[in-house]
Regions:
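Alpha-helical transmembrane segments of multi-pass membrane proteins predominantly involved
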Residues: 1-502
């Protein structure tokens, strides 16, 4: 093994770990000297600087062609999504948690950096054991971050997240063990080779089912989503942003790699009139459950955070629609949409955090009169929610159109005939989602307060970091809506280079 080359590939992760250790050291030194914890602002900017430096380090890491057997992968897909994770992580760091609830900001932001390290490592591997270890590094950090607020609700969120996460980790590890037992290979390319030698055994099928269950938890796919509403409502906004944006993007990359590299030969078909056993049918069932449950349950929510949690479940369903088609173009569309979804949800959380600070809660009525007290926040919220709803000309519309059109194309011309039923259900559920997204916008733009009276909330100025967390995603969604090829073409090329050529 060439350790110098390996170290160079791990340079972004090394930068994050070193920054986290420096931050912890500075926090200890400050507390020892002044008997006070390091300030939130100082910890935030140290962490943000580390993420930026990791991005600079990633820029200098070359793409390699040995992703089929290497422990660490730096193919075009890994490089692209490591950059995406760092960008989403930087925006999440910019979201300030409630200061009265975070007693140790040094530890809080260090855990964020450790979580990002785990997500980067997960993005860049095809090795089964290393995949599990990296994913759990990120997960353990997120469990702690979910309970960092000194509130009962945050503690409940952390406990549920940990318990459900522990069960999903057990499923994932057991599934990976069974797949290794079937293939006698520790890499996805080795699994694909074993699968090509004959029909999949019961070990392989059972292992894949358990892996899908484990990854379904990470993606908040129904029926593995029960942790999501409590975590979205109780955890600090920064943690929720990481879970909703960066963690979901990485989970989708892992699922795409697993299905398109390791088990592409066992896809089967989810056709309405010609079902063939395989993971395509599983993806279709999970997609239908996620879309229906996510959208229906979102209609009854009185907390915007919980509404966004069920929105996450529904959007996972849209992503799985594309994977049901098991084509390269559909995989590219899913990866494009998961980025767009992450930006829109992160931005919506940033505005929600500002409303919570000003009004004391995240009820839809707290958004009443937002256009009068904070006009640019209201405009940004309009961009985020209409993008999630799939209204043109924003990036969310382009993403959903790409998802549904590629699934239909595969349905008509590709290897998955008869997916029209699933695309039709997705279109209906997307239309239903308009109601709960627009109900928030109605409060923000039409009503002056909970009872039609002027809002009692007063908008305080946003910090520079918080303003960036609101403004950057909004501008990006508009630009990607007008010029989607800026991101869609690189993703499509990365999918072709990284998955098809294995």
């Amino acid at each position: 093994m060439n350790y110098s080359a390996l170290l160079k590939q791990l340079l972004p992760e090394a930068v994050l770990v070193i920054t986290a250790l420096v931050l912890l050291g500075v926090a200890v030194a400050v507390e020892a000297k002044s008997r006070k914890a390091i300030s939130h602002r100082a910890a935030l900017w140290i962490a943000a600087s580390g993420v930026v430096l990791a991005g600079v380090a990633l820029w200098g890491v070359p793409v390699t062609g040995d992703g089929g057997t290497a422990l660490i992968v730096m193919d075009p897909l890994a490089r692209l999504f490591k950059a995406v994770v760092l960008a989403l992580g930087l925006l999440a760091v910019m979201l300030p948690p409630a200061r009265r609830e975070i007693a140790q900001p040094g530890e809080f932001y260090a855990l964020i950096l450790f979580a990002l390290t785990g997500l980067l490592l997960t993005t860049g591997t095809n090795h089964l054991l290393f995949l599990f270890v990296a994913l759990e590094l990120a997960s353990l950090s997120l469990y702690l971050l979910a309970g960092f607020s000194r509130t009962a609700r945050s503690g409940e969120a952390s406990l549920k997240y940990f318990l459900f996460g522990g069960v999903s980790a057990a499923f994932l590890l057991f599934g990976l063990s069974l797949i290794y037992g079937f293939s006698h290979a520790a890499t996805l390319t080795g699994v694909a080779t074993a699968l090509g030698a004959g029909p999949p055994s019961s070990l392989a099928v059972t292992g894949l089912v358990m892996v899908v269950v484990g990854l379904g938890f990470k993606l908040a796919a129904a029926p593995f989503h029960y942790w999501a509403p409590d975590v979205y409502q109780g955890a600090p906004a920064t943690t929720v942003a990481l879970v909703a944006a960066a963690s979901k993007a990485v989970g989708m990359v892992v699922l795409v790699r697993f299905l398109m590299i390791g088990f592409h030969g066992a896809a089967g078909s989810a056709a309405w009139g010609g079902v063939i056993a395989g993971w395509s049918l599983w993806m279709a069932v999970l997609a239908a459950l996620s879309m229906v449950l996510g959208n229906v349950l979102a209609l009854a929510q009185t907390s915007v955070r919980r509404l966004l949690a069920y929105s996450a479940v529904a959007n996972t369903g849209y992503l799985l629609v594309a994977l049901s088609a098991h084509g390269e173009s559909a995989a590219g569309a899913a990866l494009f949409y998961v980025i767009v979804y992450g930006l829109a949800t992160l931005g919506a959380l940033a505005v929600t955090a500002a409303v919570e600070r000003d009004c004391g809660d995240d009820a839809p009525t707290s958004f009443a009169g937002l256009v009068h007290r904070a006009p640019w926040q209201a405009v940004a919220l309009l961009i985020f929610l209409t993008s999630l709803a799939g209204i043109p000309p924003l990036a969310g519309f382009v993403g959903k159109f790409a998802l549904f059109s590629t699934a239909m194309a595969e349905s008509t011309h590709g290897g998955s005939p008869g997916l029209t039923w699933l695309v039709g259900l997705a279109a209906i559920m997307s239309a239903i989602s308009l109601y709960y997204y627009l109900s928030i916008l109605k409060q923000a733009f039409v009503r002056g307060g909970p009872d039609g009276e002027p809002s009692a909330c007063e908008a305080a100025p946003l910090s520079i970091a918080h303003a960036l967390a609101v403004g950057v995603p909004a501008v990006t969604l508009v630009v990607l809506g007008l010029f989607p090829a800026l991101l869609l073409d690189p993703i499509t090329a990365a999918v072709m280079d990284s998955l098809v050529m294995r």
